[in-house]
Amino acid sequence: MANYTAADVKKLRELTGSGMLDCKKALEESAGDFDKAVEILRIKGAKDVGKRAERNATEGLVAVSGNTMIEVNSETDFVAKNDEFKNFAAKIAEAAAAAKANSPEELAAVDVDGQSAQDALQEFSAKIGEKLELRRAVTLEGDNVAVYLHHRSADLPPSVGVLVAYTGEGEEAEAAARQAAMQIAALRASYLTREDVPAEVIEKERSIAEQITREEGKPEQAIPKIVEGRLNGFYKENVLLEQASVADSKKTVKALLDEAGATVTAFARFEVGQA
C-alpha cells in the first residue's frame, strides 16, 4: 500500500512543477517523506539539465525592461510561446534592468528572488524539461530609449528586439527614434556612424572592392575612384545614419532624425539565435 496520498502528489507537483509520474516515483523512493521527495526531484532535475546541456537552444525570445534588453533561448517555439516562459523571461529582464546588466556573465549573475538568474534558469529548465540559455544582455545609457519588438507571427514572442538611445524632446523626436529602431530591425545596421566602423573592416572592404574592380578590367587610373564609390556603398548599407530611410527612401535616416530634432547616441539589436 502506498504511504502517500493523491493530495501529496498534487502538492508535490505544484511545488516542483514535475510530472505526476515523477512525483509518484519520488514519494515511493522517499517512503512518503515529502521533503525527501522534493530533494529527489531537484536532484533529478539537475541531472536532466546536464543532459539537456548537450542539446541546442535556438528558439526563444527577446525581452525588454527599461533601458535593458535580454535574449533567453529555448529549444522549441512551443516553449518560447508558453506564458510561463514569457513571464519568467520578463522577470529576468526586470532584474537585469535593475542591475544594468551588459554582458552574458552579468546577466547570469543578477539577483532573482535571492538566487542568481542562472540558478533560477536551471530550476525552470528542470521544471519544463527543456534546455534554456541566458544568451546575452545589453543596457543603454540615457534618459530616452526607443524600443521596437518584432514578432514573426502573432502567436510567438518577439524574435527581434531593438533599443535606440537618443536625445531630443517631444513626440516628433520620439516617433523618429522609434522609426530608427524599426529601420535597424529590418535592415540590420551594424554601425551608427562611419567613424564607428573598425579600421580592419574598412581595409577588408577596400581590398575586396579593389580586387573586384581589377577583375572587371577597369582602367588603372579609374580604380581608386571606383573603389571609393564601392566603399561608400558599403557605408550606405551598414551605417544607420547613412542608410536610406524605409519611411522615405529619398532621405537618409540622419535627415529624418534631424528634421524631428532627434539624435541617436547608441543602439542595440538582438535577433533570437543570431550573433
Swiss-Prot record:
Q: Where is this region: Involved in Mg(2+) ion dislocation from EF-Tu?
A: 76-79
Major subcellular site: cytoplasm
PROSITE patterns cross-referenced by the UniProt entry: EF_TS_1, EF_TS_2
Q: Which UniProt keywords apply?
A: Cytoplasm, Elongation factor, Protein biosynthesis
One Pfam family, please name it. EF_TS
Q: Where in the cell is it found?
A: Cytoplasm
Q: Which GO terms describe its cellular component?
A: cytoplasm
* GO MF entry, a single one: translation elongation factor activity
The UniProt family comment states: Belongs to the EF-Ts family.
Question: What is the designated name of this protein?
Answer: Elongation factor Ts
Species annotation: Corynebacterium efficiens (strain DSM 44549 / YS-314 / AJ 12310 / JCM 11189 / NBRC 100395)
Instruction: Supply the source organism's classification.
Output: Bacteria, Bacillati, Actinomycetota, Actinomycetes, Mycobacteriales
